[in-house]
Design a protein with these regions (language model features):
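Short loop/turn segments that flank or connect secondary-structure elements
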Residues: 1-152
């Protein structure tokens, strides 16, 4: 995991603002608020930054290619779209110095679907196989840990 993070640091944001204009989650805004209330740090940060689009169609009209890419990986009723209201007309954050970790760390996972123009796509392609392998190993270890605990 440290190797993946180290490689990420060799890339920098090109300020395309795609991550601010169209964020997605498998959770509705209400579900995110509930998760945040229950202590989920990611959800708390997410709802502190993003607000929901009024519909999938609105997001689709604004960013058809990215929405299409995301919808290929999720069922329609499992994906919600959001945007950051702090994005200025120049495509830059109006509160950049005070942005939360969710913004500072994006993308923190090479398994997320990134817009084609995102400068981190090259990093994603470079480390995705390693990330998938690590994810599979974690699942395998978890499975065997469960089996061992059942025997004990």
């Amino acid at each position: 995991i440290q190797i993946i993070e180290k490689r990420r640091q060799t890339y920098s944001c090109a300020c395309c603002s795609s991550c601010c204009k169209l964020a997605s989650s498998e959770y509705s805004f209400e579900e995110l608020k509930q998760r945040a209330k229950n202590g989920d740090v990611f959800s708390k940060e997410f709802i502190s930054v993003f607000v929901p689009y009024d519909s999938v169609d609105t997001a689709q009209k604004l960013y058809p290619d990215y929405v299409k890419l995301l919808r290929e990986h999720f069922k329609d009723n499992e994906l919600y779209f959001y945007y950051c209201p702090k994005l200025g007309s120049n495509g830059l954050c109006t509160d950049y110095e005070n942005r939360p970790n969710i913004c500072r760390d994006f993308p923190n996972n090479p398994l997320v679907a990134l817009p084609l123009k995102c400068s981190y796509n090259e990093w994603k392609q470079e480390v995705e196989i390693t990330a998938l392998t690590l994810h599979a190993l974690i699942d395998i270890i978890g499975y065997y840990k469960q089996k061992i605990n059942e025997v004990l």
